[in-house]
Amino acid sequence: MRLGVNVDHVATVRQARRTFEPSPVCAALIAQQAGADQITLHLREDRRHIQDRDLELIKELVNIPVNLEMAPTEEMREIALRVRPDRITLVPERREEITTEGGLDVVSMKERLKEYLKPLKEAGIEISLFIEPDKEQIEASRDVGADAIEIHTGRYQPLERHRFEEAREELRRIREAAIYARERGLRVYAGHGLTYHNVKEFVRELKDVVEELNIGHSIVANAVIFGFERAVKEMI
């Protein structure tokens, strides 16, 4: 199973002070050196963390695939066509949300997305849609021309609250959805809310049907804690 490392929250720390550090570009290069298979970043409309220049530099400097998460807006499509990431993942976006709260409703946007995606497909960019593990959404994703889906795994988090039955049921839902999507010619990825605490069981149960995980916040959080001693010693 491949790992896509999301560097958004390196930029979140930087933007808290509107300064130049820490750099998500440096983080992307370190992730690549550490063995990541892909760099994922979300250029939001409000630019709350990743900035346009981050995307441009990461695409220019890393030698592994770049996955651009973006809302289905005209502005973002223009940026994607200019920068040419290896993949775009369409996600829903609300300015008031802290993070992406759920999957894209492809069913209700079906006709619009068919037209929206045409130039991106013609440019040779892989198209992935971030959706719930739902058969209707999978069918719609195939119909609009997606190459892949990324299943929203946020509801798998009850494992961390010791609600094991709920977590097992969510794994079952994700497995069924992944199999259904693969049978219809879609590649299957997954992400959101995966941590060091719950990812091992996820991989063990789904490695035969899910090709790739995209993980960011948990990696950044661990880096802050486990790199803190070294950083303090270097300052002293």
Curated annotation (Swiss-Prot):
Its main location: cytoplasm. The active site is at residues 42, 69, 192. The record marks 150 as: Transition state stabilizer. It is found in: Cytoplasm. It holds the Pfam family PdxJ. It catalyses: 3-amino-2-oxopropyl phosphate + 1-deoxy-D-xylulose 5-phosphate = pyridoxine 5'-phosphate + phosphate + 2 H2O + H(+). Pathway: Cofactor biosynthesis; pyridoxine 5'-phosphate biosynthesis; pyridoxine 5'-phosphate from D-erythrose 4-phosphate: step 5/5. 3-amino-2-oxopropyl phosphate binds at residues 6, 17, 193, 216-217. It is an enzyme of class 2 (transferase). One of its GO terms (cellular component) is cytosol. One of its GO terms (molecular function) is pyridoxine 5'-phosphate synthase activity. GO terms for biological process: pyridoxine biosynthetic process. Transmembrane segments: none annotated. Its EC number is 2.6.99.2. Keywords: Cytoplasm, Pyridoxine biosynthesis, Transferase. Coiled coil: none annotated. 1-deoxy-D-xylulose 5-phosphate binds at residues 8-9, 44, 49, 99. It comes from the Bacteria. Catalyzes the complicated ring closure reaction between the two acyclic compounds 1-deoxy-D-xylulose-5-phosphate (DXP) and 3-amino-2-oxopropyl phosphate (1-amino-acetone-3-phosphate or AAP) to form pyridoxine 5'-phosphate (PNP) and inorganic phosphate. Belongs to the PNP synthase family. Homooctamer; tetramer of dimers. This is Pyridoxine 5'-phosphate synthase. It comes from Aquifex pyrophilus.
